[in-house]
Swiss-Prot record:
E.C. designation(s): 2.7.7.6
Organism: Flavobacterium johnsoniae (strain ATCC 17061 / DSM 2064 / JCM 8514 / BCRC 14874 / CCUG 350202 / NBRC 14942 / NCIMB 11054 / UW101)
Family according to the record: Belongs to the RNA polymerase beta' chain family.
Enzyme class at the top of the EC tree: transferase
One GO CC term, this protein: DNA-directed RNA polymerase complex
Subunit structure: The RNAP catalytic core consists of 2 alpha, 1 beta, 1 beta' and 1 omega subunit. When a sigma factor is associated with the core the holoenzyme is formed, which can initiate transcription.
Gene Ontology MF, one: DNA-directed RNA polymerase activity
Pfam families assigned to the protein according to its UniProt record, in alphabetical order: RNA_pol_Rpb1_1, RNA_pol_Rpb1_2, RNA_pol_Rpb1_3, RNA_pol_Rpb1_4, RNA_pol_Rpb1_5
Name of the protein: DNA-directed RNA polymerase subunit beta'
InterPro entries membership: DNA-dir_RpoC_beta_prime, DNA-dir_RpoC_beta_prime_bact, RNA_pol_asu, RNA_pol_N, RNA_pol_Rpb1_1, RNA_pol_Rpb1_3, RNA_pol_Rpb1_3_sf, RNA_pol_Rpb1_4
Residues reported in the UniProt entry to bind Zn(2+) 2: C829, C903, C910, C913
Protein role: DNA-dependent RNA polymerase catalyzes the transcription of DNA into RNA using the four ribonucleoside triphosphates as substrates.
GO BP terms: DNA-templated transcription
Length: 1436
């Protein structure tokens, strides 16, 4: 039962509360709430349709069926309100009380509540220390249990123990042996033998438990237990016991209340019975379930009265227990109660659970009145903040406002006649409607609302017709198009709502996208095409003369005149005198070379933005809009956007761009390219047939050849189409402007479709790339086989899209749930921690520059330019665009900034750590719900992510393997940790071969000494440079075999095989096609064998041994003499399957749920030197010894490739075997900061591959929520339990509270203190000085030991289920489990998050709903001064 704190006795006591507590209901509390007992199972009389008296719908208990009318009809009308009828006993009141009056059923025997013995963890079982099976035997009346042994002995003459189980036979035998008078003793007499069965027995046992004593006992055994299992068992029980003890601090919460004597009956309106036509009834399942309980209860009552035999009673009691079980939770039972049609009945628990349950259906998803919906059409003449609203819709939506005006003007007298006038659509109505609409915006919403821009406010314009008109620029935000999309219109009613809609939600204020701060109202499709066409330059040629080329004009007006007179073409190159910025940043007149179209465009550009002299593509436009918004203000930008839209449409129409098949140009070189590629493939096959390469290598090389041929062809095609008609080829213009189409699509139209992936059969096989590509393109047309291969990709695409939407939606929901309570609560948390941000590089390419990553953040420390020593930004200052420019110009590579990850605010987060609000470009304000914005920003693009691998219509991506490092700058080389041996490459030239595994190469700028870039040089590569050498740009540093990993001999000597037995540890594979033999290491059946190559020196001494991984190909024979640098073994790299990388959504889910990957790498936890141990159970042991003699051992599966060799030096956090590193390992070894950076970068990587930009902040907010718990390692003297998960802030507060306290070890002669008590030093001093005076033994105390804990990373689902708020957790998942744990622990919900407040019907504590605004009075300055003056007078 829910309890409201501070019940004020005003009209509606529920409105004023700020906490909600939950607990077990005692029988007394149920009776107190109840209005009467339900005695009969009848519902309503089938003839009169009136409720039966004392039945489930009884009017006496639940209230009248008709307003102010008693059952017998003696009292009618409101004047008798509150009278109780003397004939039928019904109170005369309104009928809605039937929604909240509760009844009850008195049970003849106590019944166990199914939630507490059937859900895990089993609460009753844990408290009594009984396993679930045994508990069921008691509850369902199969065994007796000894509650008190008394003087009883069992058949063998031994004393009985508490909780011994007895069959009926044994029970009766024991009763026979006892003296007669034992039965008449009182139950509490220690000599009496008490044994019972059923829930009654459990109730007795629970009532006899002393929770405190049990808690001490379990704590003791948890601390001193040796066996792991018994210890975890004790800790689990302790958790339940502790939650009961904690709950008693707030209100009484007794374990025996888990057993019910009284069952509440919910109000009849919540389980309605509706008459259908034909005399049948539709009823809620609950009525059936209640009826069964009542029937069985009444039958049991009668059987007990007539003293029926025990067997019959027991059966009846068991049936009663089962019927109450199914009433509370029908789905938990094996034998659920079903209807005739075999559908399980919906019990009380089911009405809370799931999407259709109380929480998600009614409390979180309420319906609104005053809304309309219709199809949308484009409204190109609208302003950005306007929308077209059909007249009929507006008259209906604004009806109350219109009625009021009609009555005010005296046109009508009553509301009814006003409605008539409106329905007749008289002219005066439209007149009034025009007035009412002014300054009263509407909200437009398009489902699915994936982010906050899915609902925006517009000023309506009345239009004829039935469709809503939408401004084309806001389509991106709504993700709307005009192919039949519908939108809903809502009307904000109150003045506050109207104000918020106008100030915060108006479309012209939402120009920036909150996910990344880039403009979102960007022209698309035809607008872009028009703007691109008008600003593109075309030069005269002999066959196509451009009018007016190279003329010079005085002003834009002149250009306009020339254009209108037909003397100048739109695309002509001209000169013009116009204002632009000079180098000093001042606006001055200059002569600018430009085109006629650009002059026209610059007429609408605000002066502050200067002269824009570029071809306008979509990307350019986005930057221009962002720039204009930052140098001007919102109204100016909105006006510019509207003008730009008009211009775009106008010139798209003028240009009349369309394309025919002739515009799709196929390069002439295509046939030659394909022939060349075929020749190369032939060559590869020949190599394979001669046995020079393996099948795997052949496959990889073939795929490579086709991939590069395809890339070359695409380049040629693009070049062709780019140079066609000076780039005025319509297809190219559409592509280049960003209006429609992509490089991929052009490639498939003009080049070749390329490589395709095989269908994926089961999870195991398939998904590889088919090595014969599709050579045709869509213009030439595909052959039947090619078409067939294509269809698979196309269909998979469609199926994927459908599945993806649901997945993405679920991801969004989990994100919202985990981060909904992150609100900006304070200005500055004063933390000294932050994160170091550097530019993100991938393969030395800068993916995201330092500036992009720190823009809008707050600097943690002063950032000082190392060249000039000037302070570029002070600590605590926001890094603006201007500061970013200066930082990028300096040689700084890393900046420490504040971050949500390190924010130390106890509630929510602080504004400084969050930084700039991306939707406004200013610092975040307090009350901003940044958690929800983060969830929306990450979830919204989820639908654009691919489901599995990166394909375009099934075309395999995949880049040719890299096989060398080439310098991209000139500079000096610094090489660390380099070991090489002289060897020969495949052509027989002498080369240096690298044999060290952690070789790092730095390229340093000679002048400044700044490191330009760093590379890792792979093991086994041939290196062509020396340390300290100066190289130019484009120097080849090293080369390696991209298809095989190798093991290279470091010494000259003679080879010997060890444990290499044919058929045991290696197989001889004979290639069918070539007849060549290869020795391949296989997993030995005899696990003792360790396949190893030994190298012996001249003297026959062992120089080096090499362990061989499974799947390695031997390149040397036993006894062969070798030179240093000889390749001993080739390990084929796994073929680059398309399905190799978990991409897209599944990868993001994997990261956010903190799941461990399927084949995790084994990671070293310390720095040290590697040596190999034995093989244990199919695992190879790797031993790492640190400098300080610390030794760690790791087991690596034999099937996975080991990345280290004997005597290699490894650092902590380095993988020892192949596979992905698990986030848990990173957290354990490198700490929380590293794992946070890792998660942010990995998730960003997935989005980046799809071309989606999301600011790091959003991920940081979510990851902060995943790291809010710590796991207690050692509880010390706190009340925590070992391995308990605790909120970081609770942990810190608890430790701070204990800090400096003392623990009594020996109380001496003190009467006040007990051993184990925690006291302050002051209390200890006072007590001891008292004892000293009387010469008694002093109290001995020690310092408190505080708890220690380690941070844990939780997946988003677990993190949201473990929030402090049980209401929020219950509405997310596993509703019954959450509620039942909360009830046992007597939890109190402080209503701090957004979700809890929505559920209890309060305003959310964010934005204008922040709690402190409730106590703020708004007044004028004069009022304030007057009030202050009065206050001062009052003081003196």
């Amino acid at each position: 039962m829910m309890n409201n704190r501070n019940n004020n006795k005003d009209k509606n006591p529920v409105k004023r509360f700020n906490k909600i507590s939950i607990g077990l209901a005692s029988p007394e509390s149920i009776l107190k709430e109840s209005r009467g007992e339900v005695l009969k199972p009848e519902t309503i009389n089938y003839r009169t349709h009136k409720p039966e008296r004392d039945g489930l719908f009884c009017e006496r208990i639940f209230g009248p069926v008709k307003d102010f009318e008693c059952a017998c009809g003696k009292y009618k009308r409101i004047r008798y309100k509150g009278i109780i009828c003397d004939r039928c006993g019904v109170e005369v009141t309104e009928k809605k009380v039937r929604r909240d009056r509760v009844g009850h059923i008195n049970l003849v025997v106590p019944i166990a509540h199914i939630w507490y013995f059937r859900s895990l963890p089993n609460k009753i079982g844990y408290i009594l220390g009984l396993p679930s099976k045994k508990l069921d035997m008691i509850i369902y009346y199969e065994r007796y249990v000894v509650i008190q042994a008394g003087i009883a002995k069992n058949a063998d003459g031994e004393s009985l123990q508490r909780l011994d189980f007895l069959t009926e036979e044994e029970y009766l035998n024991i009763l026979d042996t006892l003296p007669q008078e034992n039965q008449y003793l009182d139950d509490l007499d220690p000599n009496k033998f008490v044994a019972k069965m059923g829930a009654e027995c459990i109730m007795d046992l629970l009532a006899r438990i002393d929770l405190d004593a049990l808690s001490y006992e379990l704590r003791h055994s948890a601390n001193n237990e040796t066996s792991k299992q018994r210890k975890t068992e004790a800790l689990k029980r302790l958790q339940v016991v502790e939650s009961f003890r904690e709950s008693n601090e707030n209100r009484e919460n007794r374990p025996e209340w888990m057993i019910m004597k009284v069952v509440p009956v919910i109000p009849p309106e919540l389980r309605p019975l509706v008459p259908l036509d034909g005399g049948r009834f539709a009823t809620s399942d609950l009525n059936d379930l209640y009826r069964r309980v009542i029937i069985r209860n009444n039958r049991l009552k009668r059987l007990m009265e007539i003293k029926a035999p025990e067997v019959i009673l027991r059966n009846e009691k068991r049936m009663l227990q089962e019927s109450v079980d199914s009433l509370f939770d029908n789905t938990r039972k094996a034998s659920a109660v079903k209807t005739e049609s075999n559908r399980p009945l919906k019990s009380l628990s089911d009405s809370l659970k799931g999407k259709q349950g109380r929480f998600r259906q009614n409390l979180l998803g309420k319906r609104v009145d005053y809304s309309a919906r219709s199809v949308i059409v484009v409204g190109p003449e609208l302003k950005l903040y306007e929308c077209g609203l059909p007249k009929d819709m507006a008259s209906e939506l604004y009806k109350p406002f219109v009625i009021r005006k009609l009555i005010e003007r005296g046109i009508v007298k009553t509301v009814k006649s006003a409605k008539k006038i409106i329905d007749k659509k008289e002219p005066v109505v439209w007149d009034i409607l025009e007035n009412v609409i002014k300054g009263h915006p509407v909200l437009l919403n398009r489902a699915p609302t994936l982010h906050r821009l899915g609902i925006q406010a517009f000023q309506p314009k009345l239009i004829e017709g039935k469709a809503i008109q939408l401004h084309p620029l806001v389509c991106t935000a709504f993700n709307a198009d005009f192919d039949g999309d519908q939108m809903a219109v809502h009307l904000p009613l109150g003045p506050e709502a109207i104000l918020e809609a106008q100030l915060l939600m108006l479309a012209s204020h939402n120009i920036l996208n909150p996910a990344n701060g880039a403009p979102i109202t960007v022209p698309s499709q035809d607008m872009v095409l028009g703007l691109y066409y008008m600003t593109k330059e075309r030069i005269s040629t002999e066959d196509h003369i451009i009018l007016g080329q190279d003329l010079t004009f005085y002003s834009a007006e002149e250009v306009n005149i020339a254009l209108n007179e037909g003397r100048l073409e739109l695309n002509a190159r001209v000169k013009i005198r116009a204002k632009d910025f000079n180098d000093a940043g001042e606006l001055v007149y200059k002569i600018i070379q430009t085109t006629a179209g650009r002059v026209l465009f610059n007429e609408v550009v605000p002066e502050a933005a200067g002269y824009i002299n570029d071809v306008l593509t979509k990307k350019n436009l986005r930057d221009i809009i962002g720039h204009i918004l930052s140098v001007t203000d919102v109204p100016t930008t909105a006006a510019f956007l509207d003008n730009m839209k008009d211009m775009g449409y106008k010139f798209a129409f003028r240009g009349g761009l369309s394309f025919s098949l002739g515009d799709i140009r196929i390069p002439e070189q295509k046939t030659k390219l394909i022939a060349d590629a075929r020749e190369q493939v032939e060559g590869i096959s020949t190599n394979y047939n001669m046995g020079l390469i393996t099948n795997n290598e052949r496959y990889n090389q073939v795929i490579d050849v086709w991939t590069s041929a395809n890339a070359q062809l695409t380049e040629l095609a693009m070049k062709n189409i780019r140079e066609d008609q000076q780039g005025f080829n319509s297809v190219y213009m559409m592509l280049d402007s960003g209006a429609r189409g992509s490089k991929e699509q052009i490639r498939q139209l003009t080049g070749m479709r390329g490589l395709m992936a095989k269908p994926k059969k089961s999870t195991a096989g398939g998904g590889e790339i088919i090595e014969n590509p599709i050579l045709s393109n869509f213009k030439e047309g595909l052959s039947i086989l090619e078409y067939f291969i294509s269809t698979h990709g196309a269909r998979k695409g469609l199926a994927d899209t459908a599945l993806k939407t649901a997945d993405a939606g679920y991801l969004t929901r989990r994100l919202h749930d985990v981060s909904q309570d992150v609100i900006v609560n304070i200005e500055d948390c004063g933390t000294l921690r932050g994160v170091e941000v550097a530019a993100l590089k991938k393969n030395e390419e800068i993916v995201e520059s330092l500036g992009e990553r720190i823009l809008g953040r707050v600097a943690l420390q002063d950032v000082i330019n190392p060249l000039t020593n000037e302070v570029m930004v002070q600590s605590g200052q926001q890094i603006t665009e201007a500061i970013v420019k200066t930082i990028e110009a300096s040689p700084i590579e890393k900046v420490e900034v504040r971050s949500p990850l390190t924010c130390e605010a106890l509630k929510g987060i602080c504004a400084k750590c969050y930084g700039r609000n991306l939707a406004t470009g200013k610092m975040t304000q307090r009350g901003e719900a940044v958690g929800v914005i983060a969830a929306q920003s990450i979830g919204e693009p989820g639908t654009q992510l691919t489901l599995r691998t990166f394909h375009v219509g099934g075309v395999a991506g995949g880049i040719s393997e890299e096989s060398s490092i080439v310098t991209r700058f000139a500079g000096r080389l610094e090489i660390e940790d380099l070991k090489t041996v002289k060897g020969e490459d495949s052509e027989g030239n002498a080369v240096d071969i690298v044999v060290s595994r952690s070789t790092e190469l730095k390229l340093v700028d000679e002048g400044t000494g700044i490191v330009l870039n760093t590379h890792n040089i792979p093991y086994g590569s041939s290196i062509f440079v020396k340390d300290g050498e100066t190289v130019g740009k484009g120097t080849v540093i090293c080369k390696w075999d991209p298809y095989n990993g190798v093991i290279v001999s470091e010494f000259t000597g003679k080879i010997a095989y060890e444990d290499l037995e044919q058929g045991q540890s290696f197989m001889v594979e004979i290639d069918e096609q070539t007849g060549f033999q290869e020795k391949v290491i296989s997993e030995a059946r005899n696990k003792k064998l360790i396949p190893t190559l030994l190298v012996y020196g001249k003297e026959g001494e062992l120089i080096r041994s090499y362990n061989l991984p499974v799947g390695a190909h031997l390149m040397v024979e036993n006894g062969e003499k070798i030179k240093a640098g000889k390749v001993l073994v080739k390990i084929p790299r796994r073929s680059s399957k398309a399905g190799d990388i978990t991409g897209g959504l599944p990868r993001i889910t994997e990261l956010l749920e903190a799941r461990n990957p399927s084949n995790p790498a084994v990671v070293s936890e310390i720095d040290g030197v590697v040596s190999f141990g034995k093989i244990k159970r199919g695992n190879r042991e790797i031993v790492i010894e640190s400098k300080f003699g610390e030794i760690k051992k790791y087991l690596v599966k034999l099937s996975s490739q080991i990345l280290v060799q004997e005597n290699d030096f490894v650092r902590a956090g380095v993988p020892l075997s192949d596979g992905a590193i698990t986030p848990d390992d990173i957290l354990r070894i490198q700490g929380p900061a590293a794992v946070q950076q890792y998660l942010v970068n990995e998730i960003q990587e997935v989005y980046r591959l799809q071309g989606v930009k999301i600011n790091d902040k959003h991920f940081e907010v979510v990851i902060r929520q995943m790291m809010r718990k710590v796991k207690v390692e050692d509880p010390g003297d706190t009340l925590f339990l070992e391995d308990q998960l605790i909120h970081t802030k609770d942990f810190i507060l608890q430790n701070d509270k204990l800090y400096g306290m003392k623990v009594v070890e020996d109380a001496g002669d003190s009467s006040v203190l007990k051993p184990g008590q925690i006291i302050s030093p002051r209390e200890l001093r006072d007590e001891n000085s008292l004892l000293k005076r009387t010469d008694k033994n002093l109290v001995v105390a020690r310092d408190v030991i505080t708890a220690t804990a380690t941070p844990v990373l939780q997946g988003i689902t677990r993190a949201s289920l473990q929030t402090k708020s049980f209401i929020s957790a219950a509405s997310f998942q596993e509703t019954t489990k959450v509620l039942n744990e909360a009830a046992v622990a007597g939890k109190v919900d402080d209503l701090e998050g957004l979700k809890e407040n929505v559920i209890v019907g309060h305003r959310i504590p964010a934005g204008t709903g922040m709690r402190e605004y409730d106590n703020t009075i708004v007044g004028s300055k004069d009022d304030y001064n007057e009030m202050m003056a009065n206050k001062e007078e009052y003081i003196y």
